[in-house]
């Protein structure tokens, strides 16, 4: 029985090593097809854009140093708007001439705020942005919630009042947060618009504050749902500066997306089978550790190549 368990663990380790190496190979392939420095800013679904992410990004950027052209591979489901704005500012500060952001499959909500820091956003057929609607936590509510959902609830409430549906109005009103919390929720939408406008006017719409304000308004209030899919065409329609992935990068970017998906599949499978003992948990989270290690390795590889090139 012990031998069987050992074989299973070795097989699992071999699979994780293979998937991790494939992801690294895909990253290096993408780097070869790119002009400028490539920075994988990947925040897995079990994490969010928060204070820890900010410190990690800052540490990475200090290692990378200022670059003329910075290409950011961005993946995240979102998180804190204030932190996302700060990360966007850092990316702008470390890219002297051009900042391109590639949504690596999904860059939703607060990650879309980060993407708005770019000079242009490069999207494939699978790339997806989302409305700027970060989930917030208020003392009066146990779970995180969408400020946009609160806004839509208030609009529905207003409509039902106009139609004289008193019972529906009473039921809806009882489920809403207290007035102070409502005010905080709605204020967060205005804060999101302001963050978007400031990042957009810094680079993408440099000097055109009116265009930046229009696009920010659409990203915050223009969609009915927090998870709405903003693909390439939709991003174009609302006025973002987007371009399709160049032909020479198309295969590499797809391999990268699929490679990351496989890493995440391995993690989810390991989590579903883990026990509560320390070694089992450690084994389950290894794909996340491998991911960070791969990111640091490709940063070091690019830095070494640049140093050799400058010495010549």
PLM regions: where:
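Terminal-region recognition feature
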Residues: 1-106, 112-312
